[in-house]
């Protein structure tokens, strides 16, 4: 099936209710604890959860539906000050149960992290947002289709710089996703990402990925940036994907949006006004027998 998708969405009003967990370390992804030895309370895991439901109406079909888009639960904690862990499962990803993250994270030296297990690979900006961090009810095509990659492997991360903080991430992975972990691989599958933080509010991210999940090697390149000032958040991202031996047409994907937050005093914390341009050309998962 060939899909050519282009969408422009304007949300006039989006009400957002936020709740902040009162935890000592806010350890959502696995962090280092600055202690030589852990106290009893430090061994207690943190539990995080997100439930997201929605109602959709299809004007062309004159039909509607309710859906539980996400019901995520994650557990994070530490077994040593420099050894953290995370396990996350989605009990209802459009009706499907999916194991998302299952990894251990080490902090061997200052500013260096080593993560091994099942995780989201370092690639793109929007795909790395959890459901409670997303700006729109529906994810962009980059986050959902062409850049949404979780895999099993190892990732190294390093932070440096004071004037312009830089975060580098890169790793090696199976390349076949989460369900085919028993397969043996001869090819090298990797992903890398560099983030530059300019003037505290301007973030630039560059990503590259090369995988061979099926019969055809796929090379992807991504550049994105966002700028925050006052109550505004402006973001743009472009992804370019190619296939070895010109097996399929090259893929282009764009996600750009602007967000303005209006603080509220009662019940809800804010009201957000958003506009987005979101598009993707035809793409394939690398299997010569099918195109999506």
Model-flagged regions — what are they?
Residues 185, 195-285:
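Detector for outer-membrane/organellar transmembrane beta-barrel domains
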Residues 28-33, 113, 218-219:
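An N-terminal domain-start capping segment
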Residues 1-31:
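Cleavable N-terminal export/targeting peptides
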Residues 35-175, 186-188, 195-203, 274, ...:
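Outer membrane beta-barrel
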Residues 99, 126-130, 180-182, 218, ...:
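Outer-membrane beta-barrel and related beta-rich outer-membrane complex signature
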Residues 291:
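Conserved small/polar residues in nucleotide/adenosyl-binding loops
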Residues 25, 29-35, 263-268:
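Intrinsically disordered, low-complexity Ser/Thr- and acidic-rich flexible linkers and loops
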